[in-house]
């Protein structure tokens, strides 16, 4: 699997800005080998937008039931029909979600043909009390599905939108903790990822991708991150071929 770059737009961006953003990405696609997943608000889903092969659309949530009387919710099957291939689950900004509910959502997503990106991460209190390992193990045990393909996103809650990022050793250790909980190899990092710190993050050998929040809203900033990723893997591939 290629290096995964996920853009979480949260509740930002009108459909017109999304169409413009995707158009710019399509124009640059011959320069990009990474897998890009753009997660816009539901209102921007691409009913008639042409996407190049390395660009996928993801949702920011889905319900844990296929259909039913759940006002204001959207099912994984509906997302699939709209053209989604990924769905992000368990983000800390989705307040008060239970771990068991996140697990049900991930399983119904897989059953519906979506690839879930399941978020795990400790809050500031757990981080200060050195309970990160304990929290991550518990979340993995209770959030991750028992079958199918998925990606785990380590996103420490205290790092989201703060500009603060754990040091590389700390991130690498958490990735190893997650790997002991699952046979899946696709583990990405999220939390204040930007063009200023992506080069440093790319030196983490067991990192499979990044989850980007506010830095993905501006195309130029987002593309700077992509360029640094491409440069890194171009150099690696060059060394391998030589």
Curated annotation (Swiss-Prot):
SUPFAM superfamilies: Triosephosphate isomerase (TIM) (SSF51351). One of its GO terms (molecular function) is triose-phosphate isomerase activity. Substrate binds at residues 8-10, 161, 192. Keywords: Cytoplasm, Gluconeogenesis, Glycolysis, Isomerase. The active site is at 91 (electrophile), 155 (proton acceptor). Gene3D superfamilies: Aldolase class I. InterPro entries: Aldolase_TIM (IPR013785), TIM_sf (IPR035990), TrioseP_Isoase_bac/euk (IPR022896), Triosephosphate_isomerase (IPR000652), Triosephosphate_isomerase_AS (IPR020861). One of its GO terms (cellular component) is cytosol. Pathway: Carbohydrate biosynthesis; gluconeogenesis; Carbohydrate degradation; glycolysis; D-glyceraldehyde 3-phosphate from glycerone phosphate: step 1/1. Its main location: cytoplasm. PROSITE patterns: TIM_1 (PS00171), TIM_2 (PS51440). Involved in the gluconeogenesis. Catalyzes stereospecifically the conversion of dihydroxyacetone phosphate (DHAP) to D-glyceraldehyde-3-phosphate (G3P). This is Triosephosphate isomerase. The gene is tpiA.
């Amino acid at each position: 699997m290629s290096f995964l770059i996920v853009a979480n737009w949260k509740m930002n961006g009108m459909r017109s800005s999304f169409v413009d953003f995707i158009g710019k990405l399509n124009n640059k696609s011959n320069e990009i080998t990474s897998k890009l997943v753009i997660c816009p608000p539901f209102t921007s889903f691409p009913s008639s937008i042409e996407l190049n092969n390395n660009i996928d659309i993801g949702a920011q949530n889905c319900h844990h039931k296929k259909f039913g009387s759940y006002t204001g919710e959207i099912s994984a099957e509906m997302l699939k029909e709209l053209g989604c291939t990924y769905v992000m689950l368990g983000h800390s900004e989705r307040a008060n979600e239970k771990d068991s509910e996140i697990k049900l959502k991930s399983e119904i997503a897989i059953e519906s043909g979506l690839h879930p990106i399941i978020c795990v991460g400790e809050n500031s209190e757990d981080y200060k009390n050195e309970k990160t390992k304990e929290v991550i193990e518990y979340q993995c045990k209770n959030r991750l599905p028992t079958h199918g393909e998925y990606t785990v996103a380590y996103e420490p809650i205290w790092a989201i939108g703060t500009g603060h990022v754990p040091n590389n050793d700390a991130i690498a250790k958490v990735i190893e903790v997650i790997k002991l909980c699952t046979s899946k190899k696709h583990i990405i990092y999220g939390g204040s990822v930007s063009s200023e710190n992506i080069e440093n993050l790319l030196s983490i050998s067991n990192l499979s991708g990044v989850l980007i929040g506010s830095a993905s809203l501006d195309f130029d900033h987002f593309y700077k991150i992509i360029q640094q990723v491409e440069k890194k893997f171009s150099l690696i591939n060059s060394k391998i071929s030589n």
